[in-house]
Amino acid sequence: YKSSSADTMNSKTYPRTNDFQTVYLNTVIKNPAIMVGDYTIYNDFVNDPVLFEKNNVLYHYPINKDRLIIGKFCSIACGAKFLFNSANHTLGSLSNYTFPIFFEEWNLDKGDVTSAWDNKGDIVIGNDVWIGYEAVIMAGVHIGNGAVIASRAVVTKDVPPYTIVGGTSAREIRKR
């Protein structure tokens, strides 16, 4: 997939000549709540990888103040998703409706929004992490340095450094 904006992008966006499926992720991120270390790459053979923020970072609303922090030298495969707190519904309340995302529009106290549901916090990815094809990383998860997330794994809990996990919900396969 060749980016429609390839001619206008910084030449440092694409790490390999004539490969428009892979980007250095920190060159395409605009949201200040998403921090990406040097040399971290994202590959997408389905969609334009420049659109990572739109297509892969989901339910990331500014009102929650949660962040996506990705370390250096990470490899993120096509379709990996990062699901944030706003994807959660308040199972302990009277309604399953997503009232908290409307706090601003309804002029409610925005200071209460994070107490309106179980806010899990930031997603933090260490250095040298490999995230496989269509893996899903849930809100609040911390993945240690050197970890490997298998294809289509759903990661709901922290992953220790240098650990390979896979499955739904992801479980340790072995250390590396």
Where would I find each of the regions flagged by the language model?
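Extended, small-residue-rich solenoid/repeat segments and analogous flexible loops
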Residues: 3-34, 99
